[in-house]
Amino acid sequence: MGASGRLLRAVIMGAPGSGKGTGSSRITKHFELKHLSSGDLLRQNMLQGTEIAVLAKSFIDQGKLIPDDDMTRLALHELKNLTQCSWLLDGFPRTLPQAEALDRVYQIDTVINLNVPFEVIKLRLTARWIHPASGRVYNIEFNPPKTVGIDDLTGEPLIQREDDKPETVIKRLKAYEAQTEPVLQYYQKKGVLETFSGTETNKIRPHVYSFLQMKVPETIQKASVTP
């Protein structure tokens, strides 16, 4: 457990559409943690044209997963720059070999699992439509266009991204479940897994904050409670 003067090593997990990305950003800002997102890390390396990014891109272009060894090397290399910081990992580890490799180098204090029912996520993601030219995003449930399928400003048709089509969403969720279930079981056995269940991210977040309040070293919290 995090104690005063100790650095926090945390991981956040959740399916695509669970609110993990937004949640991570808010948590890291509130508690002044370093946020290491595997997606951001890959994009940053691709911009720099690093050797590992070129390798990773070749797998992504073929629709394959980046091998565990390469993903682990990338994440651990970045974590070397954060030895004096408390951090939250987002998108890594994604597989059991990655979790085991991380464990050999760092002791993970807590793993936050955002458990949102797949049916809710499916509705959330498939309700999203975009106007390609401007990037404007509509949500049929919360922010619908004035006319179904039409952009409010230009009158041009809206499209649904391939990733947001129902059949793709179901496939992504099943792939996530198959890949991460062993990771969740691994952390459960270690006694560091904390699962937060619900259908609305805004209602889950306060419980995550309360839990982290007990975990985050006091030295970090002082800054976040100072007006």
Curated annotation (Swiss-Prot):
Give the EC class as a word: transferase
Binding locations of AMP: S38, R43, K64, G91, R94, Q98
Q: What is this protein called?
A: GTP:AMP phosphotransferase AK3, mitochondrial
**Which species does this protein come from?**
Rattus norvegicus
Q: Which family does it belong to?
A: Belongs to the adenylate kinase family. AK3 subfamily.
* Keyword Signal belongs to the record: no
Give Gene Ontology CC terms.
Answer: cytoplasm; mitochondrial matrix; mitochondrion
At which residues is N6-succinyllysine found?
K20, K29, K57, K64, K80, K174, K189
